[in-house]
Amino acid sequence: MWFQLKIEHCPNDKIEEITEELEEYGALSITLTDKNDNPVLEPEPGTTPLWPEVIIHALFAQAEEAQYVREQLVAKRPSLHCSLELLADKNWERAWMDDFRPQRFGNRLWVCPTWLPPPEPDAVNLMLDPGLAFGTGTHATTSLCLTWLEQADLKNKSIIDYGCGSGILSLAAIKLGAKHVYAVDIDNQALQATQSNAHANHITESQLSISTPEALQNPVHLIIANILLAPLISLKERFHQLLPSGAHLVTSGILEEQAPLLIDAYDSAFTHIATEYCEGWSLLVFTSK
């Protein structure tokens, strides 16, 4: 049996401090999850990539141990809401695994958890383990990007996946025919997740490069960026340098009402050619001028 301590109402600027304390108290595992099922999108430089409302889960072997940690945390931070849950063996793994089911995007692309067989073995199947980082296709922004990629002609194209997260867009692009993808992120955990998922899908170094954004040098046919509005605007000139005239830029990670702001900000360097919406989020397609 296992005992899970669930910590809510935790200010983002205290999360690192609390997770360090949990490690000192001997937590067997510590997991951060999103209260509202939002994705972790590329933050502005110098900020920590966290959801607006984070829940911390800490696993302990003894009830007394978990209760003691709960009391210590609440005594120091009365605003925290801490609850205990008894978990049967392996339920702590199954809890999130059961929620991740195979999903289809477009006509031929499936995103499947690594522990389940693909529903259509002959389809384009991307095997994904989201436990290491973020991005499973369940959020509207990721779904918009995957659907666009599935419908696009990616054969022999070079692509930058800016803010790669779990690597889901990079790997999908390769599975759909891209010649080479540059997966970049400012978060080392995201780069590690992308590498792990690439290995699970038998993706080679000749198909995928994984790095921080500073390593980008070569122009590409397409950039796809599922990141927030502020970094998207700040990256306009950088994207323009990496895209020859007529090349495509696909952006998501922005709300419907933010779309006009990005279109206006990009007008000097890019031509807006298409927009898709899903659950209040938007995907914008541009060509480089």
UniProtKB/Swiss-Prot annotation:
Gene3D superfamilies assigned: Vaccinia Virus protein VP39
GO molecular function: protein-lysine N-methyltransferase activity
EC number: 2.1.1.-
Major localization class: cytoplasm
Catalytic activity: L-lysyl-[protein] + 3 S-adenosyl-L-methionine = N(6),N(6),N(6)-trimethyl-L-lysyl-[protein] + 3 S-adenosyl-L-homocysteine + 3 H(+)
Signal peptide residue numbers: none
Residues annotated as binding S-adenosyl-L-methionine: T142, G163, D185, N226
Primary role: Methylates ribosomal protein L11.
Protein name, per record: Ribosomal protein L11 methyltransferase
Organism this protein belongs to: Legionella pneumophila (strain Paris)
Gene: prmA
